[in-house]
């Protein structure tokens, strides 16, 4: 049995789970999330706990078991607490600022890069070298953070670029001068 899939999920008091035909809907103080449900797994709700069980032991059922347990857990956490991803900008003259609902990035190119967050994602710049991506959908937060990081990935020689908080950039040594 899946180590992740067999663990029950604690349903927070402020979160509400609705299971309909092939669809999951989780609502809470921060918003509402929906997820289509495959027929290989079923979701059972008991008092304060939610369990995900698989129908049979096929390879696909085993794969979906752990996946849907984590998706449901992330949905419950998202509508109650929310998710935040922090990006750090390193480099001389590199900075970020909010211009209305657009994120304006100066990353050493001849032009500024403007990025509009999709619906359900909030962007903040507490200081010029930090970008906070927050919202209730963990997958969407990660996708938006990866998109912003892709504008100028950290390079290994000087470490300039946009990186996740806590990400370690393996540094390389430059070419050694010959005699």
Swiss-Prot record:
GO cellular component: cytosolic large ribosomal subunit
Keyword tags: Ribonucleoprotein, Ribosomal protein, RNA-binding, rRNA-binding
Molecular function (Gene Ontology), one example: rRNA binding
One of the Pfam families matching this protein, by short name: Ribosomal_L6
The keyword ATP-binding appears for this protein: no
GO biological process: cytoplasmic translation
Matches recorded under InterPro entries: Ribosomal_uL6-like (IPR000702), Ribosomal_uL6-like_a/b-dom_sf (IPR036789), Ribosomal_uL6_a/b-dom (IPR020040), Ribosomal_uL6_bac-type (IPR019906)
Record family assignment: Belongs to the universal ribosomal protein uL6 family.
Subunit structure: Part of the 50S ribosomal subunit.
Annotated function: This protein binds to the 23S rRNA, and is important in its secondary structure. It is located near the subunit interface in the base of the L7/L12 stalk, and near the tRNA binding site of the peptidyltransferase center.
Identification of the protein by name: Large ribosomal subunit protein uL6
The species this protein was found in: Chlorobium phaeovibrioides (strain DSM 265 / 1930)
The gene coding this protein: rplF
């Amino acid at each position: 049995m899946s180590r992740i899939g067999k663990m029950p999920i604690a349903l927070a008091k402020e979160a509400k789970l609705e299971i309909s035909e092939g669809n999951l809907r989780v609502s809470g103080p921060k918003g509402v999330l929906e997820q289509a449900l495959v027929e290989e797994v079923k979701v059972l709700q008991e008092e304060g706990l939610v369990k995900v069980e698989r129908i049979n032991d096929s390879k696909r059922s085993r794969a979906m078991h752990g996946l849907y347990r984590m998706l449901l857990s992330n949905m419950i956490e998202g509508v109650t607490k929310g998710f935040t991803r922090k990006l750090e900008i390193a480099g001389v003259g590199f900075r970020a600022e909010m211009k209305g609902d657009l994120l304006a990035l100066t990353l050493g190119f001849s032009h500024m890069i403007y990025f509009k967050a999709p619906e359900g994602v909030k962007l903040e710049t507490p200081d010029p070298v930090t970008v906070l991506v927050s919202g209730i959908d963990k997958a969407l937060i990660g996708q938006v953070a990866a998109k912003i990081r892709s504008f100028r990935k950290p390079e290994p020689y000087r470490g300039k670029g946009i990186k996740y908080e806590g990400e370690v950039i393996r540094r390389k040594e430059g070419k050694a001068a010959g005699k």
